[in-house]
C-alpha cells in the first residue's frame, strides 16, 4: 500500500454524512489521503442524490460506519493524482461511475466485476467507504474506473450516466429487437430502462407508474403506453395485451415486495426474462408464485442485477450521449447551486413528490 502526504492548509472539509440512523448532516470530516499510487482524489463539481442514499439514511439495512460520507453519483475535478496514474491529470473533469470494481482481484477474470473478492465489492462508495458528498473523495484505480467528460456532453447528462443510465441499461441488456417489454417503475432507473429497451429495438414497451413528471419523459424515451398501478391490475393488463402469452422481458425498477411476484406472473413461459434492478429493503422474502412459475418448470429466467461500472462502460454511455442517441439530463427536475443544498435534495428524494425525478447540485467547488 502506498501513502502520499498532502500539503494542504486545512485537514478538515465539508461532507454530508450519516450521523446516525435516520439523520444525515453536513459535518467536518478529515480530508482523504491517497492510499495507492493508482488512485486519485477528486472534488465534486456536480452531484445527485439517489434513492439508495435515502435507503442508507432511513432504511433498515446493515450498520454503517460512523459518520459515513454519503453519495455515489458525481462528476468531479481531479485534484491529486497517484504517481502511477497514466491517463488523468489535475484539473481533468471526469464522470465517476457509481460502481468501482476491484480490478486487483482474480475474480475479475471470471467476469465478476461487481463482486470480485467480496460480495458487492464494487458497490462501496457512500455505502461502506466514504462517498462523493464531500469537498474531496478518493477513487481507486483511476485509469480503470474514471471517464473523461467529452466535449459537448453536459454536466447533467454525465451525472445521469454514472448510475441511472448504467443501471437502466443493464436491465435492457436482455431485450431483443421486437420484444414486448414491461418496465415496472418510472423513476430514474425505470426511465433509463425504457430508453435502453427502445435503443435495443424493443417493439411494444409498456411502462408502469404514476409519477406526473415521469410520464411525458417515458414517452420521449420510447414507451408505447404508460399505465398506472392505481387504475389497472397490471398482471391482467399485460396478459390481455399479449393474448395471454406474457411479456418477453419484465424489468423491475420500482414497486414493493409484491412486484417481484407480479413480474413472474406476467412474463412468458419458456423464454421470458425478469430482470430486477430494485433494492428490496428490510427482511422477509421475494416470493416466486408456484402457479406462474410452472411449479418450478416454466422456463422463465430471473436476473438480479446492479448497474455496471468501470471506465469502458462509462465511456460508452458518454459516447452515446455525445452522438445524440439519448438525453439523460431530461430526468433532472431540480437543480441547486451550492453544496449545502444536498440536505434539501435528500428530503426531496425521500418525499418523492409528483414533480420530482432527479436532482442535481452544482457544488460551486
Residue ranges and their predicted role:
Residues 95, 248-251:
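N-terminal Rossmann-like NAD(P) cofactor-binding module of classical short-chain dehydrogenase/reductase
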